[in-house]
Amino acid sequence: MNTINASMTVIGAGSYGTALAITLARNGHHVVLWGHDPAHIATLQADRCNAAFLPDVPFPDTLHLESDLATALAASRNILVVVPSHVFGQVLRQIKPLMRPDARVVWATKGLEAETGRLLQDVAREALGDEIPLAVISGPTFAKELAAGLPTAISLAATDETFADDLQQLLHCGKSFRVYSNPDFIGVQLGGAVKNVIAIGAGMSDGIGFGANARTALITRGLAEMSRLGAALGADPTTFMGMAGLGDLVLTCTDNQSRNRRFGMMLGQGADVQSAQEKIGQVVEGYRNTKEVRELAARVGVEMPITEEIYQVLYCGKNAREAALTLLGRTRKDERSSQ
């Protein structure tokens, strides 16, 4: 392959990165998929599928595997980063000196920066500088369904209108993958972080056995927390009624493909945090996101009671049922209250 002609380089060969690479390649684009483990990339190349996570989806011929980072980054000006949020900044600093001069960076990572709670746009600007166009994609996307070509829709926000148009054209597929543009760069990022937290809470509720009424109440009040935090950060409230907000929230709170939901269910059934994480076997983004979202909310003065109680369970040893009863026992409020 003449790597100069690749439409996209995907950084991160986990389940979601692989699914996005497959989707792009299925659209007829040459795509390079890079992973940090050469042995893993060699296995993907030999199997021509991601047998660990997406065993029934063969790679299109236009999907190319690469273990050398410099070669992968030379392949395309468009770089899609799909790595866990706690290594996001580290990965950007790693790729910065190897990127092409005309590089543009989009990420599908959902979350905030570990320890600081900063938005990923701030991490990206610090790592990459002010000149590189940035974009984010987010929405209700389980990797298995996306890779299988089942109908999916997401939101896309970018700092550069041309980049947004180009990405929408690259990703959009009328048969299965609908991409909605959205100018709200902050809101599209924030929804993906907060929904991870609320999904843990919904899982806890179901694990305890509280039923559909309680789950729906958590989703609805979780959306209110998301919207309040977004408003404090300057996001457009309508964004949270779209794919990156309500769409992703409903998906991850109601389907057991969600690692965050399954993690919460185990906690609700009495498992401790460590054993629940070990049973999941993959990164549970909501675990770190809970701490980060809580810190961000405190910094901007937004009350998020659901997030607070989930934090108490994850980091302070509080029992999940006790946390739920604390929420139920809060003083009466107007539904439209800012608290």
Swiss-Prot record:
Catalytic activity, reaction form: sn-glycerol 3-phosphate + NAD(+) = dihydroxyacetone phosphate + NADH + H(+); sn-glycerol 3-phosphate + NADP(+) = dihydroxyacetone phosphate + NADPH + H(+)
GO CC list: cytosol
Binding site for NADPH: 15-16, 36, 110, 143, 259, 283, 285
Pathway in which this enzyme or protein is active: Membrane lipid metabolism; glycerophospholipid metabolism
Superkingdom in the source lineage: Bacteria
Family matches, as SUPFAM superfamilies: 6-phosphogluconate dehydrogenase C-terminal domain-like, NAD(P)-binding Rossmann-fold domains
Subcellular location: Cytoplasm
Keyword field: Cytoplasm, Lipid biosynthesis, Lipid metabolism, NAD, NADP, Nucleotide-binding, Oxidoreductase, Phospholipid biosynthesis, Phospholipid metabolism
Entries under InterPro entries matching the protein: 6-PGluconate_DH-like_C_sf, 6PGD_dom2, G3P_DH_NAD-dep, G3P_DH_NAD-dep_C, G3P_DH_NAD-dep_N, NAD(P)-bd_dom_sf
EC number: 1.1.1.94
Residues engaged in binding sn-glycerol 3-phosphate: 110, 139, 141, 195, 248, 258-260
Function statement: Catalyzes the reduction of the glycolytic intermediate dihydroxyacetone phosphate (DHAP) to sn-glycerol 3-phosphate (G3P), the key precursor for phospholipid synthesis.
Family per similarity comment: Belongs to the NAD-dependent glycerol-3-phosphate dehydrogenase family.
Protein name as catalogued: Glycerol-3-phosphate dehydrogenase [NAD(P)+]
Organism in which the protein naturally occurs: Cronobacter sakazakii (strain ATCC BAA-894)
